[in-house]
């Protein structure tokens, strides 16, 4: 087997994109989970250079999974479903492609609670000002899971509201360019 990417660590809940450097054709694709991990992944897709999703003809791997947490969840389009093994060592899953293909892009989303910036969803950022929440405006989420606002007050207390479907909110500040949750 050929290792085409190693995930060093994940600090953000969002979709991640990998562009493999190897340009050959693959017949099999596999994700090998680190030890002490159950292979928790919500979504995992492979694409060719034309940006078509590569179709699988057979799933393979560790199927000693928790109920409703099988490999079919990896490409069901539901960010809340996920693969979850009973095992913690040597956990892997993959598939045989319908035909050998170049893999131009891999997109994956770790297991999450869907509490991150989502593409196409509307958000509104507020800051606390003398006893009331003031709006800094509405923005639409992008694939990179980044919202950019101008004229944001320094040393303020913020709250981001997902206007599309949000009900859980936490306040936060920025310190040295990093978001601090309270």
Residue ranges of model-derived segments:
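Residue-level detector of beta-strand structural context in well-folded domains
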Residues: 18, 93, 123, 145-147
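A broad, low-specificity signal marking well-ordered, structured residues that form hydrophobic/aromatic
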Residues: 29, 93-95, 123, 158
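Non-cytosolic beta-sandwich-type ligand-binding/adhesion modules
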Residues: 1-7, 109-145
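Noncatalytic modules at the cell exterior or secretory-pathway interfaces
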Residues: 21-34, 150-164
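Ser/Thr- and Asn-enriched, surface-exposed coil loops between beta-strands
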Residues: 12, 25-27, 89, 141-145, ...
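Disordered, acidic Ser/Thr/Pro-rich linker "stalks" and the adjacent N-terminal cap
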Residues: 1-25, 36-103, 111-118, 163-182
